[in-house]
UniProtKB/Swiss-Prot annotation:
Glutathione binds at R189, T190, K191, F192, R193, N252, S253, G254, Q255, G302. Residues 345-581 form the ABC transporter domain. This is Iron-sulfur clusters transporter ATM1, mitochondrial. Residues 89-137, 184-249, 306-603 are mitochondrial matrix.
Amino acid sequence: MKEMSRYLWPKDSWGDKLRVLLAVGLLVGGKVLNVQVPFFFREIVDSLNVDIAATGGTVATVAGTMIFAYGASRIGAVVSQELRNAVFSSVAQKAIRRVATRTFGHLLNLDLNFHLSKQTGGLTRAIDRGTKGISFLLTSMVFHIVPTALEISMVCGILTYQFGWEFAAVTALTMSAYTAFTIWTTAWRTKFRRQANAADNKASTVAVDSLINYEAVKYFNNEKYEIGRYDKALHQYEKSSIKVATSLAFLNSGQNIIFSSALTIMMWLGAKGIVAGSLSVGDLVLINQLVFQLSVPLNFLGSVYRELRQSLLDMETLFNLQKVNLSIKEKPNAASLVLPKGGEIRFDNVSFGYYPDRPILNNLSVTIPAGKKVAVVGPSGCGKSTLLRLLFRSYDPQSGRIFIDDQDIRDVSLDSLRRSIGVVPQDTPLFNDTVELNIRYGNLDASREKVLEAARRAHIHDKIESWPHGYQTKVGERGLMISGGEKQRLAVSRLILKDPPLLFFDEATSALDTHTEQALMSNINEVLKEKRRTSVFVAHRLRTIYDADVIIVLKEGRVVEMGSHRELMEGNGLYTELWMAQEMSMHDQSLGRSEREAPVPVK
């Protein structure tokens, strides 16, 4: 509630504050008019509870004014309520937008480790339910809880003043019993709702995971397995939902028994008053109307309290996401990264591991010279891609420091650091949108001509133009509607459009055929020579990086060799072993193809 008050009463928006005050004014006015309705009804009954034929007169003269006042009060109460809804709706929707935007922005700023450990389906579900919970909380507070409390207070005061302590005592006992029963039962039901929420998140996560990996499901004929996983999650949700529904029936029954008992007692007391001559028939009608008038807000209060507890649970999850600490933080007033040397990168005794018991880099020290093409090679798991994640500050090293042109990357702003680095990852992330938007994502302000030029330089323009919808072709979720090679060339196009001073290629051509790879690498090399960009190529296929100015060989998180291709081959070390193993593999594959293609001799 404290968190929500900042959004409901924003410091910087006098317009929203005025709307809240106007909504409160309409609320009070509407409830005052609503409470007047039973009084006018009593006057109408008492006015007509005489022998009109004997006394003379008409409906207009006997009860006309009261009937008009009765109708006007009902209309006024309804109009006030609807105006209140209309006035407050903009406040509620703005608050929801602010919370959702802030949470979404916070999630985008969290470190990579958080997103790798969380499942997307569960996060989106939590945000969706949380924003709905906020909407319900705001509307229930303004439209149900506060109006109900005001109406109950007014009715209790009227019953006490008009009819004495007995009616007041019954009313007070009813309110206490109703409220206590509702709170106790709802608290008991909360654990069932929590279980249902957890099962709902699990089912959503399983569904999203299976649909995203649709091809893998098909490749291994595991449809039944995935359906079984989903059904198992839904079965848990089913069991929890049955408990929720059963406990709700118990709650509703108890509330109705309490209220009906109170109404019966009050009607008995009213009837006794009529027999004793202290009350009129109109008074009995007034008591009945006032008590029934309480039934609607009380029923609302019961249902609102139930939903309010659920909404608070959902909001708790949402606000807890906002409270997740940023492990990667920039210093206050951090300076922007500048590159006076052109982008020299230096790792100084860097140690890092994704898990404490599994170190990846061990006191690694290496310098990547500015304006040079540098390759990083080595066996799988030696830490090649980890260098990029540390440089990009997706993670911070456990020890050691990383410098760019003698500036510790922890001392510069994250925005300037990440704007200076361009990446072509091995698994290209694409949005479910057009080809043009996915290329333009490298520079959202780029003109169409620059987008086309970037595509040409990445050797993908002609291919795109051959598609029926050209640059407006949708690539599908995660780019599933285009080939792996096309995805990689789109990623290169995006990088060329961004045009950063530091370039990282993580197996950027692994999905390309030899001819396309050679043409693309030729264009990339032209870009590097034109602007003397510092570039780092992570590669397994050594033939793609043999022309690098410097080749860094990693093993078990340390630099074991460093030099040009010729120098490393002369050194006869790990690089030579890797090169010879790949050459032998290519020779065997070529020999195998030749044997398969050789003509069978005719006997």
